[in-house]
Amino acid sequence: MPAGSTFEISENDGGARVNWDSLGGSLASTPAVTSWAQNEMQVFSIFTDGQLWSRYWDGDAWHEWHAQGGELTGNPTACSWGADRIDVFARGRDGALWHLWYGPDSWQPWESLGGQMTSDPSASSWGRDRIDVFARGEEGDLLHAAWDGKTWSFA
């Protein structure tokens, strides 16, 4: 497999494995993926240009890669707390946590959530309007940001 490319593998109805398909790209990070609706999913990766790029599956076909911007490093993480909502988090070149979100009809601009991370973030949604993001801080501590549907809180 060529370095810096994305691949997918799927099973046919009989359970037999098929070959990996290249989805292209110039990946510099591990991809992150989330689903925001039935038969819909979106994959994200930081490319060699330092920007986040995404590509989505609509249930029938993969759409082309789309640049989402940012000045990022490391590996992104993504989650969804409801239909037509996607949240993506990544560590910026400044060490801060950066957030990008989609909903309901368009991508919103990147926002810095601050902090100084020394690891890639991990995010999870445990209900509608609920997201928790974790990362390692400068002193080896666990940083935590939580969204309650209205505001971010930090611990």
Residue positions per predicted region:
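A structural motif
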Residues: 1-155
